[in-house]
Amino acid sequence: MTTQYGFFIDSSRCTGCKTCELACKDFKDLGPEVSFRRIYEYAGGDWQEDNGVWHQNVFAYYLSISCNHCDDPACTKVCPSGAMHKREDGFVVVDEDVCIGCRYCHMACPYGAPQYNAEKGHMTKCDGCYSRVAEGKQPICVESCPLRALEFGPIEELRQKHGTLAAVAPLPRAHFTKPNIVIKPNANSRPTGDTTGYLANPEEV
């Protein structure tokens, strides 16, 4: 493998505006049922009474997540046709001419990255905009973020710059697939496995 690329996600900056998601959909010409990049909204808290005085501990934060181009991708392991594969540059992609649309990859991926495109009759997913990267450009989601909450580059450089945190609630633990992401947590971020909050927009992710 030449260089493993990855994403840095700054949850302290992300406002959940979905510009990255819409830019991706426009660039990839995706229908309403498919979104390669999705915004997770995690929220929780309640009101508590203390001697007649009410206090709140309500919180919410956002995570912009696409395919994490994992070191140990679950999707490639279950693909019966070999359509889902990891390139030399680390991008996990699907060969749409080989894919049979069985959806095993979608069921295996803990992030739901591979998505079935009913119009095309096969699986589709984020490819890291590898054609843009080859031209020295940034992925369209990174380029479009108005808050500069996304960053892209060789994952080791991102880890040296931003640390190694790769999971907060509601994401799964990182050891399952070894995702190539780095997360800067929001001040309200909860650890993976947290039960004090909930995914506030499940139909969108």
UniProtKB/Swiss-Prot annotation:
This is Probable anaerobic dimethyl sulfoxide reductase chain YnfG. The keyword Metal-binding applies. Residues 5-33, 59-89, 90-119 form the 4Fe-4S ferredoxin-type domain. It comes from Escherichia coli (strain K12). Keywords: 4Fe-4S, Electron transport, Iron, Iron-sulfur, Metal-binding, Repeat, Transport. PROSITE patterns: 4FE4S_FER_1 (PS00198), 4FE4S_FER_2 (PS51379). PANTHER family: ANAEROBIC DIMETHYL SULFOXIDE REDUCTASE CHAIN B-RELATED (PTHR43177:SF5), PROTEIN NRFC (PTHR43177). [4Fe-4S] cluster 1 binds at residues 14, 17, 20, 145. Residues 183-205 are annotated as: Disordered. GO terms for biological process: anaerobic respiration. Electron transfer subunit of the terminal reductase during anaerobic growth on various sulfoxide and N-oxide compounds. [4Fe-4S] cluster 3 binds at residues 67, 70, 75, 109. Pfam families: Fer4_11, Fer4_2. The lineage of its organism: Bacteria, Pseudomonadati, Pseudomonadota, Gammaproteobacteria, Enterobacterales. SUPFAM superfamilies: 4Fe-4S ferredoxins (SSF54862). Residues 186-195 have a biased composition (Polar residues). Its cofactor is [4Fe-4S] cluster. [4Fe-4S] cluster 2 binds at residues 24, 126, 129, 141. [4Fe-4S] cluster 4 binds at residues 79, 99, 102, 105. GO terms for cellular component: oxidoreductase complex. The complex consists of three subunits: YnfF, the reductase; YnfG, an electron transfer protein, and YnfH, a membrane anchor protein. Binds 4 [4Fe-4S] clusters. GO terms for molecular function: 4 iron, 4 sulfur cluster binding; metal ion binding.
